UniProtKB/Swiss-Prot annotation:
Protein name in UniProt: Glutamate--tRNA ligase
Record motif 'HIGH' region, residues: 9-19
Domain of life: Bacteria
Similarity comment: Belongs to the class-I aminoacyl-tRNA synthetase family. Glutamate--tRNA ligase type 1 subfamily.
Biological function: Catalyzes the attachment of glutamate to tRNA(Glu) in a two-step reaction: glutamate is first activated by ATP to form Glu-AMP and then transferred to the acceptor end of tRNA(Glu).
Annotated source species: Aliivibrio fischeri (strain ATCC 700601 / ES114) (Vibrio fischeri)
Catalytic activity from the UniProt record: tRNA(Glu) + L-glutamate + ATP = L-glutamyl-tRNA(Glu) + AMP + diphosphate
Keywords carried by this UniProt record: Aminoacyl-tRNA synthetase, ATP-binding, Cytoplasm, Ligase, Nucleotide-binding, Protein biosynthesis
EC category name: ligase
GO biological process: glutamyl-tRNA aminoacylation
GO CC term, one of those recorded: cytosol
Amino acid sequence: MTVKTRFAPSPTGYLHVGGARTALYSWLFAKNQGGEFVLRIEDTDLERNSQEAVDAIIEGMHWMGMEWDEGPYYQSKRFDRYNEVVDQLLAEDKAYKCYASKELLDEIRAEQEANKEMARYDANHPKIVAANAAAKEGDACVIRFRNPKEGSVVFDDQIRGRIEISNSQLDDLIIRRTDGAPTYNFVVVVDDWDMGITQVIRGEDHINNTPRQINIYEALGAPVPMFAHCAMILGDDGAKLSKRHGAVSVMQYRDEGYLPNALNNYLVRLGWSHGDQEIFSQEEMINLFSLSAVSKSASAFNTDKLLWLNNHYIKSSEPEYVAKYLQWHLDQKEISLDNGPAITEVIKLVGERCNTLIELADQSRYFYQDFEEFEAGAAKKHLRGVAKGPLELALAKVEALEEWTTENLHNVIEEVCAELEIGMGKIGMPLRVAVTGGGQSPSVDAVMQLVGKERVVARIKMALAFIAEREANA
């Protein structure tokens, strides 16, 4: 039997961190088992759904690299199938029409609470029996599933172990509303049955739904999938993860400069572990992932840890991979790569210093765009009269260079130091400010090599003009 998992988000918002981790676990399990992964959009709530949310979910899945084998399927296009199964259950007396109004049910619930009874639907309540008896053909009604009254529902959760719920705790679930819309707990059963889903991996907030769904599977004679319920993700303060803890949408992490491999690595470790290993390639995640290694306990989201992972992936990934995701940020900042070095060379040089792709884009700018002024603090400290002689000598030497290599540029700096009998900082820092516009960069000889001879010469001249003006105004 082919293992088949699914991710089934509701398009009422963006793909959030909790949903992304659930999708990742489902995707990894399917890949680990040589199975298939299905994407299904649960869009039966027509009032709250939006195409924008659907697009955001699909964009987030693509960005994270979780491609699906089937789908996306849309529940809103399957109403005929749901009605067909409702009719089957009605014909087999496994479902029935209920004419009790919402007002009547609210009244009964208030009485139960006043009498300190468990508030629940009871088909045999005299007022409900009377409402059904008084109904006429064509009156508004819901369809309820006839839940077993005896026994228990038992299932082996692949994360939490054996779970047992008495049927006496479950009431007769509405499977179709008065407006004809099918309900969540019903349609997911029909979908998972039709789509051959073998493992349902989802959040622990669905545990209470599982026994209700299992009873529907059994009433339909459908195979019951295995279930695995993941613990929730908390903020680093122990509260439920929310916007105040930082980004909660997957695409917000894209916007903030994270690599998908870093986010995937971080999310997989929010609940799953393999010894003390922290860094996992996608191939390792697929090969090592198992539900038995997923913790029952909630995990705390730590942005500092994610930032550390992002820096690791920026500096250790192939430059071509980083460049693929950096391009979006370069576009946002209107940095064109048409006039400058290969971006992969810039990534090799600058990437190690950057925690995010936003930082990397910012630190790439001076390789491709000229600046009109120097950073004030750096210029005040390093572009002074004392730097004039070293910069003039360096300018003459770089203009005379026939081979523009990092080694030759390093030799130029050493020659300036030797001829003027100055320390490296007396020329290195003024050159850095002149060439980059600021006081921080990788090794200045390597930076100069990538910036290119024409720009380096022009920028040293600009720095000398700045010093001359500063002296004139002193």
